[in-house]
Amino acid sequence: MKVILRKDVAALGDAGEVVAVKNGYANNYLIPQGMATRATEGTLKALETEKKQQARKVELQRTSARELAQKIEQMVLKVQAKAGESGKLFGTVTAGDIADALKAVGVEIDRRKITLEAPVKLLGKYEAEAKLFSDVTVKVTFEVEAEGTEA
């Protein structure tokens, strides 16, 4: 019997795949557990339209991520941090600080998607990398300034 998997099933396949299994396995386990449905003409057509909609949705997300990447590349963020007279920071600038600076200019990115190559412990200009989508990453340029200075 051919079934369409609704959930990932170990040693059988991933959700959305059409697989052939024995009748008893399908009728007594997969279908009652909600892990699969029978593969009829109607369900196969529904699966195809669902896959097309999902592909369109992913492409829209990818396009918006690329547009956001172009917007971010043109920015130079200002990050305020407490610093001594020699320019050394009290603490470090983290991905969370960069995410807050992006949020202040209207761009919201989760701090876990921002990576710094090395800890930022001095005043100056730096770059971080933000992953906006599975294949869209962007360099975020930011300048660390001492608190109290106006730009």
Curated annotation (Swiss-Prot):
Keywords: Ribonucleoprotein, Ribosomal protein, RNA-binding, rRNA-binding. Signal peptide: none annotated. It holds the Pfam family Ribosomal_L9_C. InterPro entries: Ribosomal_bL9, Ribosomal_bL9/RNase_H1_N, Ribosomal_bL9_bac/chp, Ribosomal_bL9_C, Ribosomal_bL9_C_sf, Ribosomal_bL9_N, Ribosomal_bL9_N_sf. PROSITE patterns: RIBOSOMAL_L9. GO terms for biological process: translation. This is Large ribosomal subunit protein bL9. It comes from Chlorobium luteolum (strain DSM 273 / BCRC 81028 / 2530) (Pelodictyon luteolum).
